[in-house]
Curated annotation (Swiss-Prot):
The protein's name in its UniProt record: Adhesin P1
Keywords: Cell membrane, Cytadherence, Membrane, Signal, Transmembrane, Transmembrane helix
Entry GO terms, CC: plasma membrane
Pfam families named in the record: P1_N
Source organism (scientific name): Mycoplasmoides gallisepticum (strain R(low / passage 15 / clone 2)) (Mycoplasma gallisepticum)
Keyword rRNA-binding: no
Record family assignment: Belongs to the adhesin P1 family.
Compartment(s) of residence: Cell membrane
Compositionally biased intervals (Gly residues): 195-208
Bias (Polar residues) ranges: 259-273
Residue numbers spanned by region Disordered: 182-208, 244-273, 541-562, 1066-1122
Length: 1122
C-alpha cells in the first residue's frame, strides 16, 4: 500500500508544479512587469537626513549663482565652495558635486553610460586630461535644451577669479585722483604715468601706456606745416595730413590718474599675453560636458568631453580691416584741432570741448587701426599694435552659456568682474560637441563670431516708423568699421520660442569721429549742412549770426572776440547711422569706449548653427541672417541720437513706451539718458545688466522677457514670427529710496560735479577745459541707501511657478508679480542679515538665500498657501526631506503584488483623461489602486495627479506615470517616500482578460488530466492486482479439484473393483434370475456424484484458501429382487 501512495505522489507532483507555474505567469501577466524608475538612485535611508547645500557663491561677470534644472528630478546646479558646483534637488539636498580640484575623483568618471547604466571608460584614446581642470573654477552652467540629462559647465582660470574686484559706487571720486595734473608742457602730460600704475587710464580705468611708436617728434607728415591753434592758416586747416598722436599738435583730452592702478587694463592683464593664452591650457577657459545618470548611485555623473576656448578662435574671424596694419604709419586719422574756450553746451544744442579734432574721413577700405579705433584710443584691445583679444576682454567674453543638441554658445558677460568700463564682450563663441562612440568622446570644434558681423543686419526704416530723424549709430558698413562691444546680461531661448534666442544687453555706439570718447554729436539739422559752412559764435559759444551760416574757408577769430567755426564741428562726413538695409551705412569714424544704451534683439539659432566656420568678405551675406529680423531691435526707446545737456539727475519714473513717446518726455526718451538714469544715477555701473528670464503674463496671455538694469526691471515682448510686433522695452522701477537720493545743487562754472568721463582733461591741464564726454553720474551730495544698492549686492532675478519676478539686495528683497504689461505688485522682504547669494528654483514659489555667516541656506517662501506675500524663514534648512514633506507631502507607487489585477483589465485609453492645461493624466478613480500618498499636514486637500509622461499609442501596451501635486498654481513632482529622488513608473500588460479566465483556462485541463491519471492509477492498479489473485486462486482451485478428482476416482475404482469381484462370484444365479424375470431389468446403480465445488468468493486478502468440497457419501448397495 505504501508503495502505491509513493507512486501516485511522484506522478502527480510535476503536473501540479506545471499548473501552479502557469497560474503564476497568468496572474503576474496582469501586473506591471516593467517598474522602471527614471532618474532614481534608490531609496534613501529612513533617518530623513541628507547632505546639505554648502555655502553658495556668485560670479559677477555673468551674474551666476545657480541654474534651475528641469526634468523628472528638478532642482538646481549651484556654485559652491571655492571652485565647485553642486547638483541639488528642490529642497536643498546635494545629489552630487563636481570639484575640479579633485582630479582623482574626476579621472574615474571619464566615460559614458552603457545600456545598463554602468559607467564605462572609452576603449580608445581620450583627447583630454581632467588634470588640466585643477587650475580652474566653475563659474557657470547650462542644461542642454534637448537632453535634460546633459549639462555643460564653464570653467575659467583660477587667476581670473582671484582678480574679481569689489564693485564701487559710481562716483567720480571713487575712480580718479582728485588732484588735477599740473599745467605746463602738454606733451609731458600726454605721456605722464599715474601713481603706482605705470599707465595712463581711460575713464573706466582701462587706458594703457600709448604705443611706443606714438612718441615720435611732433611734426606734420609730407607738407610739414604747423597747425597751431592760434596761427592756423587756411591751407593748414584743410590739409589732409595726419599728425602724430603724441605731439604738441594733439589736443585730444588725456586721462586723469586712476585712484586704484589695479583697475587699469595693463594691471589686470598682468603680463598674460595673447600668445601665451592661446598656448597654455592653464590660462584658457574650458567647457566640460557632463552626463547625469541617477540610476547609478556610485557614479551619478560622467565627464564625457571637454573643449578649451582660445581667444584665437574669435580673432581668426575678425574682418580683414580689423587686422590690417596702418596705412599712414600714424595709427590715427587726426588731421588738426579746433580750439574753443567754452566747452559747455548751449541752448542751440551745440556741444564743444576746448579742443576738438578734424579727422580724415574713414573709407570702407581704411584699416581699422587708422580710424578712431586705434591703439591710442582703445589700448584695452591692442597688443603690440595688433587688434587682438587681451586677457581682460577674453575673460569677460567667457559667459552667457547656452546649449542645445550639442551646440554650445558663449554670448559673453557684462564685464563687471573688474572696475573697468572697457571690459566688454566682443562676440559669440560656438563649440560643437560631436556624438561620442564607445571608443572616443567625439571631436569638438570652437569658432568665434564678432558681434560686428552678427549684428550687421541692423536696419531702420525711418519713414515707416515715423520716429527720429537721426537714427542711432549702430549701422555697419561693408568695411566693418563699427566695432560693437556688449555688456551681455544674458540670453534666453525657451522651448516655446521657436528656436529664437533673446539677447539682453547694453551696447557701444559708433561716432562721427569727434573726440576719441565722443558719444554726442549735433542735431540732425546740423549734420545735414554742407561741410564748408561756418557760423560765428562769441566767447561763450553762443551763436551770433541769426541768419544763414556764412560760407568761409577757415575758422577765423574776430577782433570782437567772436570766432567763425565749422557748423559741422567734428567732421566733414556723416556718421554710421542705421540705414534702411544692412551693410550700407557710412563707416564709423569712431567707436565709444563704453556702452551707451540698452540693446535687445533676437537671433536665429538655426542660422547660428549653420554659419560657416570662417568669415570672409565673400560669404558675409550669410552672417547678415543671424538676426531674426534686422528691424527687430530696441534701445528701450526711440532709435535716435539725441544727447543730454542737463545737470539734473534723471529719476526716470516712466514705465511705458507711451509715456516715453509723449511730447513732455523730452530727453528722458533718449536711449543714453535712460541707461544712465537706471544705472549710474543710482550708483550702478552702466554694465550692470543681468538675469535674463522668460515668463508668462496671465493677463495678456503672452510671454515676455525680463532682465535687470541697475535699479529697475525691464521687459521686452517676444518677437513674433510676422516680424512686425513692436519691440520696445517697458520699465518697472523698484523703490527709489533703496538706491540713494540726491540733494539739489546749483552748478556754476567753478563747480566740478561727479561725472564719470570727467576724468578727461584737456591737453592744457586746465580744469575748466576738461572734456565731458558722458552723462552726469550723480552730484557729490549723493546719499547712499542703508539697504544696499550696488550691483555687488544684487543676488538674482527669477521667475517662479506663479509667474513672479524675484529681486533681492543685501538686506532687502522684492517679489514682483506682473499683473499686466504696465503694473507690478511689489512686496518688499526685509532681511536681518546680509545675503551673500540666492539660489533660484523654478518649480517652487520660493527661493533659497545664503545669509552672511551661515553654513546653510534659508528659505524665502509664501507666508501661507492663501497669501501672495513672501517672507524669510528664520530657521536654516537642516532637513531637506522634512522641508519637502511639509510642502508637497510624500508618496510611493504600490508594490506590483498589491495592485489589483482589475486595473490592468482596462484599456489605456479608458483610464487616461485630459485636464484643462492640456496634459494627459490618469483618471483620478484609479490613483489609489497604484499609488499611495501622504499629503502635508497643513494642506491635506492638496491636489494630486499622475501625469502621463509617455505611453504607446500604436500598440497601447504601456504607460509611464509621474506623481505631481498642485503647489502655488503649478504642478510639482512628488519624490518617493524617504528618498530625495523623484521617479516615474512604467506599467505594461493592459487590456488583459478578467483575472479568472486565464487561470481557469490553464487549470481545468491540468485538473482533468490529473484526475484521469489519478483514477487510472487508483482503479487500474487494484484491478490488475485482483486479476492476478483470481488467476492464482483459480489455479489453486483447479489443482485441488484435480487432486480431489483423482482421490474420488480412486475411491470409485476401488468400489468398482470390489463390486466386480463379488458380482463375478454370483453371476450365474443372478443371470438366471434375470432371465426369468425378463419383464424388468435390474436398475443400474447410480454412480457416486460428488457435488460441484462452489466458486471461490472474493478473497478478503490475497492467498485465502478456497472452501474444500464436501466428501461424497458411499452409494448404498442395490437390493437383490427375487
Amino acid at each position: 500500500m505504501k508503495k502505491l501512495i509513493f507512486k501516485l505522489s511522484v506522478g502527480i507532483t510535476p503536473l501540479a508544479l506545471i499548473g501552479l507555474g502557469s497560474f503564476g505567469l497568468a496572474v503576474s501577466g496582469a501586473k506591471p512587469n516593467n517598474l522602471k524608475p527614471v532618474n532614481q538612485v534608490g531609496e534613501m535611508n529612513s533617518q530623513g537626513q541628507s547632505n546639505l547645500l554648502e555655502k553658495a557663491r556668485r560670479w559677477r561677470n555673468s551674474n551666476f549663482t545657480s541654474l534651475s534644472i528641469d526634468g523628472t528630478n528638478p532642482g538646481a546646479l549651484v556654485l559652491t565652495g571655492s571652485k565647485s558646483i553642486s547638483r541639488i534637488d528642490l529642497y536643498g539636498n546635494v545629489i552630487w558635486t563636481f570639484d575640479p580640484g579633485n582630479t582623482n575623483d574626476l579621472t574615474g568618471k571619464v566615460g559614458f553610460y552603457d545600456a545598463n547604466n554602468r559607467l564605462t571608460a572609452f576603449s580608445g584614446d581620450v583627447p583630454f586630461n581632467v588634470s588640466d581642470l585643477s587650475s580652474k573654477t566653475v563659474v557657470e552652467a547650462t542644461q542642454d535644451q534637448e537632453d535634460p540629462n546633459v549639462f555643460y559647465l564653464l570653467l575659467i582660470p583660477d587667476a581670473a577669479v582671484q582678480q574679481e574686484q569689489k564693485t564701487k559706487d559710481q562716483v567720480f571720486e571713487n575712480y580718479f585722483m582728485s588732484d588735477a595734473p599740473a599745467t605746463g608742457d602738454t606733451s609731458a602730460e600726454g605721456s605722464a604715468t599715474p601713481a603706482g600704475g605705470g599707465s595712463s587710464s581711460s575713464a573706466a580705468g582701462g587706458g594703457a601706456v600709448a604705443p611706443a611708436a606714438a612718441s615720435s617728434t611732433a611734426r606734420l607728415v609730407e607738407e610739414g606745416n604747423s597747425a597751431g591753434m592760434g596761427t592756423m592758416t587756411p591751407t593748414a586747416s584743410t590739409s589732409e595730413t595726419v599728425i602724430d598722436y603724441n605731439s604738441d599738435q594733439n589736443k585730444i583730452p588725456k586721462p586723469k590718474t586712476l585712484l586704484d592702478s589695479s583697475e587699469s587694463s595693463e594691471s589686470i592683464n598682468g603680463g598674460r599675453t595673447y600668445a601665451n593664452i592661446n598656448t597654455q591650457n592653464n590660462l584658457q577657459g574650458v567647457i566640460v560636458k557632463v552626463n547625469e545618470n541617477l540610476f547609478n548611485s556610485e557614479n551619478p555623473f560622467a565627464v564625457e568631453n571637454m573643449a578649451f576656448i582660445k581667444p584665437k578662435d574669435m580673432v581668426d574671424n575678425y574682418p580683414s580691416t580689423w587686422t590690417q596694419g596702418s596705412a599712414n604709419g600714424k595709427m590715427t586719422n587726426v588731421l588738426q584741432f579746433y580750439k574753443h574756450d567754452n566747452p559747455n553746451a548751449v541752448n542751440n544744442r551745440f556741444y564743444r570741448a576746448k579742443y576738438y579734432p578734424k579727422r580724415l574721413e574713414t573709407q570702407t577700405t581704411t584699416p581699422l587701426i587708422d580710424s578712431s579705433f586705434s591703439p591710442y584710443e582703445h589700448p584695452e584691445w591692442y597688443e603690440d599694435n595688433q587688434f587682438v583679444m587681451p586677457w581682460m576682454q577674453y575673460i569677460t567674453n567667457l559667459g552667457g552659456l547656452y546649449a542645445k543638441d550639442g551646440m554650445v554658445y558663449l554670448f559673453g558677460g557684462n564685464g563687471t568682474w573688474v572696475n573697468n568700463e572697457s571690459a566688454l564682450s566682443i562676440g559669440v563663441f560656438r563649440t560643437k560637441f560631436e556624438n561620442r562612440t564607445a571608443e572616443a568622446p567625439g571631436n569638438t570644434k570652437t569658432v568665434g563670431y564678432p558681434y560686428g558681423i552678427l549684428l550687421s543686419a541692423i536696419s531702420f526704416d525711418a519713414t515707416r516708423n515715423g520716429l527720429a530723424l537721426a537714427p542711432a549709430s549702430l549701422g555697419q558698413d561693408v568695411g566693418y568699421h563699427f566695432v560693437p562691444r556688449l555688456a551681455v546680461g544674458g540670453v534666453s531661448s525657451p522651448r516655446g520660442a521657436n528656436g529664437n534666442i533673446f539677447l539682453g544687453s547694453a551696447i557701444t555706439w559708433g561716432t562721427n569721429g569727434g573726440n576719441f570718447l565722443d558719444t554726442k554729436w549735433h542735431s540732425p539739422a546740423v549734420i545735414e549742412d554742407a561741410p564748408t559752412t561756418f557760423v560765428t559764435v562769441n566767447s561763450s559759444g553762443a551763436l551770433q549770426n541769426s541768419g544763414n551760416p556764412q560760407p568761409t574757408s577757415t575758422p577765423m577769430p574776430n577782433s570782437n572776440g567772436n570766432e567763425s567755426i565749422p557748423y559741422r564741428w567734428t567732421n566733414s562726413y556723416d556718421y554710421n547711422s542705421v540705414r534702411f538695409a544692412a551693410l550700407i551705412s557710412k563707416p564709423a569714424g569712431g567707436n565709444t569706449k563704453q556702452v551707451e544704451s540698452l540693446f535687445t534683439t533676437a537671433l536665429k539659432l538655426d542660422t547660428l548653427n549653420s554659419l560657416p566656420n570662417k568669415f570672409t568678405q565673400e560669404n558675409n551675406i550669410f552672417f547678415s541672417y543671424a538676426m531674426l529680423d534686422g528691424r527687430q531691435w530696441s534701445l528701450g526707446t526711440r532709435k535716435d541720437s539725441a544727447w543730454l545737456t542737463t545737470n539734473t539727475i534723471n529719476n526716470f519714473t516712466y514705465n511705458t513706451q507711451q509715456q516715453l513717446a509723449s511730447t513732455v518726455a523730452g530727453e528722458n526718451a533718449n536711449p543714453r539718458n535712460i541707461l544712465n538714469a537706471l544705472t549710474t544715477a543710482k550708483g550702478f555701473d552702466r554694465r550692470d545688466i543681468g538675469n535674463v528670464v522668460y515668463t508668462y503674463s496671465n493677463n495678456t496671455n503672452k510671454f515676455t522677457y525680463y532682465y535687470q538694469v541697475g535699479g529697475a526691471i525691464t521687459t521686452w515682448p517676444e518677437v513674433q514670427v510676422n516680424y512686425k510686433t513692436s519691440a520696445n522695452i517697458t520699465y518697472y522701477n523698484l523703490t527709489r529710496t533703496d538706491f540713494g537720493s540726491t540733494t539739489p545743487a546749483t552748478q556754476d562754472a567753478n563747480t566740478v560735479s561727479s561725472k564719470l568721463n570727467g576724468a578727461y582733461l584737456s591737453s592744457t591741464g586746465d580744469q575748466q577745459g576738461w572734456y565731458n564726454g558722458s552723462i552726469y553720474v550723480k552730484k557729490a551730495s549723493f546719499t547712499p541707501s542703508s539697504q544696499g544698492y550696488t550691483w555687488q549686492d544684487f543676488k538674482g532675478l527669477t521667475t517662479t511657478a506663479s509667474n513672479a519676478v524675484i529681486s533681492n539686495w543685501t538686506k532687502a528683497g522684492y517679489s514682483i508679480r506682473p499683473d499686466d504689461d504696465t503694473v507690478f505688485n511689489v512686496s518688499k522682504i526685509p532681511f536681518e542679515k546680509e545675503i551673500t547669494a540666492a539660489v533660484n528654483v523654478r518649480s517652487l514659489d520660493s527661493y533659497y538665500v545664503q545669509l552672511n555667516g551661515e553654513t546653510s541656506v534659508n528659505t524665502v517662501a509664501r507666508v501661507s498657501p492663501d497669501s501672495s506675500a513672501l517672507a524669510l524663514n528664520p530657521n536654516r534648512i537642516t532637513n531637506p526631506l522634512m522641508n519637502r514633506d511639509n510642502v508637497i507631502g510624500q508618496g510611493a507607487f504600490i508594490s506590483r503584488n498589491d495592485i489589483p489585477s482589475s486595473f490592468f483589465e482596462n484599456k489605456i485609453n479608458d483610464i487616461v483623461t485630459t485636464e484643462a492645461d492640456g496634459k494627459e493624466v490618469l483618471d483620478s478613480k484609479y490613483i489609489n489602486s497604484i499609488y499611495r500618498y501622504t499629503p502635508p499636514q497643513n494642506n491635506p486637500d492638496i491636489r494630486l495627479r499622475l501625469l502621463v509622461i509617455d505611453r504607446s499609442r500604436a500598440t497601447n501596451d504601456f504607460i509611464k506615470l509621474l506623481p505631481q501635486v498642485l503647489v502655488d498654481g503649478e504642478y510639482v513632482a512628488v519624490p518617493q517616500a524617504n528618498s530625495v529622488f523623484v521617479s516615474d513608473q512604467e506599467f505594461t500588460g493592459f487590456d488583459a482578460l478578467p483575472g479568472y479566465v486565464l487561470p481557469v483556462a490553464i487549470s481545468i485541463p491540468i485538473i482533468i488530466i490529473a484526475l484521469a491519471l489519478a483514477l487510472g492509477l487508483g482503479i487500474g492498479i487494484p484491478m490488475s492486482q485482483n486479476r492476478k489473485m483470481l488467476k492464482q486462486g483459480f489455479a489453486i482451485s483447479n489443482k485441488k479439484v484435480d487432486i480431489l478428482t483423482t482421490a474420488v476416482g480412486s475411491v470409485f475404482k476401488q468400489i468398482i473393483n470390489r463390486t466386480s469381484v463379488t458380482n463375478i462370484k454370483k453371476t450365474p444365479q443372478m443371470l438366471q434370475a434375470n432371465k426369468k424375470d425378463g419383464a424388468s431389468s435390474p436398475s443400474k446403480p447410480s454412480a457416486p456424484a460428488a457435488k460441484k465445488p462452489a466458486g471461490p468468493t472474493k478473497p478478503s486478502a490475497p492467498g485465502a484458501k478456497p472452501t474444500a468440497p464436501a466428501k461424497p457419501k458411499a452409494p448404498a448397495p442395490t437390493k437383490k429382487i427375487e
